């Protein structure tokens, strides 16, 4: 009877809760990396498990305490300041132009205002869907190739605004209905970035089928992993690199490499003090520091934070937990997108792009709540 009660409680766990997402994401990395774990070594493995446990517990703490994060204007103002700082700082690092940096922030704020005003209208989704398709077509025309089949183009568009616009617009619009989902899925595959495909798929499941049975979720996850493995193999073939690995072995090796990078970070005792997470394309410093060549390298969700701030990065994990709780209790569609982002970054590692999207989602959620309060006041 006791075992049955435990099983029933497990069944009641929300698989799409932020903490569940983070635990499942890291668990999948360890499962996939299992064939190669001997290469990391038992001692190093225990060390990275200890570090990850501290950060995940820190992330979990805000959800343990029975506190309700209620809206007040301070959240709106703080989210605005955070978004403004990250946007202007990042744009200035790239463009070295204060004018362009401010213009970039204004563009983001205009998009946020339009979202708050029209997000319930179908025309808004249709426009975003069209923008996503147009941005993809422009990439193909400008670079003269489909990124999935051309490795050089794929690497070139890593920081291309058109790619980010296309991916963001298609993920948001693609979870609205099946037709948009199928078209968006195909385009994101052709864009050549597995993270975009994963995010669309997970966001669609969370938003449309939140109460899906666990066994079906496992089957869908397995099918998605196989597909992402095949996609990774196609990308590798287009790079002219000779890897004698099948799609599943490729995923396993990629997961192992993420853990290997984390073990190198833990053993390095280097503190980069924000150079990785607060700088656009800061991930290439990981390769420079650990492997002596500048190259964008992924690790686990909190690996970059640990490299920047060491064990004190656990405080950031707690702050991320607080923000995640606020987004989780907010707009369901925005949370579906955030949950998919959180899962994807379990393998990538928190970076500047993640922080910008996080601050944008926080700001939009606060704006939505504020708009509802104003509406209630006006109706009184």
Curated annotation (Swiss-Prot):
Its main location: membrane. Signal peptide: none annotated. It is a multi-pass membrane protein. GO terms for cellular component: plasma membrane. The keyword Membrane applies. InterPro entries: O_anti_polymase. It is found in: Cell membrane. The chain crosses the membrane at residues 15-35, 45-65, 75-95, 98-118, 123-143, 182-202, 217-237, 303-323, 341-361. It comes from the Archaea. Keywords: Cell membrane, Membrane, Transmembrane, Transmembrane helix. This is Uncharacterized protein MJ0420.
